[in-house]
Amino acid sequence: MREMQLASALTTRPARRILFLCIHNSARSQMAEGWARSLAGPEVQIWSAGTEPSRVHPAAIEVMREVGIDLTKQASKGLEDVPWQTMDTVVTVCGEGDEVCPVLAADVRRVHWPLPDPSRVEGEGQLDAFRKVRDDLRWRVASLLPRGD
């Protein structure tokens, strides 16, 4: 049901060059990049970046490893490190989506997923918060990709 709702909210044009964007490029955008690389075919190019990059959060690495996706080779990147001007789809994955998104060409599809920041959860509940965002991202990312991937 959620996949159908999300798919209907997007245009029918399949995403071929996707940028996942947030502030620190440490958790949500990194997990989205990991899912997209895992689920997409070779014709889809995928990046993630942040407006104030930091490091990939260890809990993001851990929970993605649980589903067989290795984030250890991914790094936190700034917009200057990715070809953001060439994207056909930019997905903001934080509550500050409009504030962090650069000025884009009119034909760039902008998608906003206001996901909670799991790194703000402290203590024993943090890994569960990361898992919840990880699982939510999986179906969202899958809905962006061309059918059959």
Outline where the language-model segments fall.
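A short acidic, often aromatic-flanked loop/helix-cap motif at beta-alpha or helix-coil junctions
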Residues: 54-55, 81, 116-121
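Conserved active-site segments centered on acidic
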Residues: 2-80
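Alpha-helix C-terminal capping/helix-to-coil transition sites in glycosyltransferase folds
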Residues: 84-86
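Short glycine-rich anion-binding loops that position phosphate/pyrophosphate groups of nucleotides
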Residues: 26, 95-99
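Redox-cofactor binding/interface segments in oxidoreductases and associated redox assembly factors
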Residues: 92-93, 112
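Short, Asp-centered acidic motifs that coordinate Mg2+ and/or phosphate
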Residues: 89
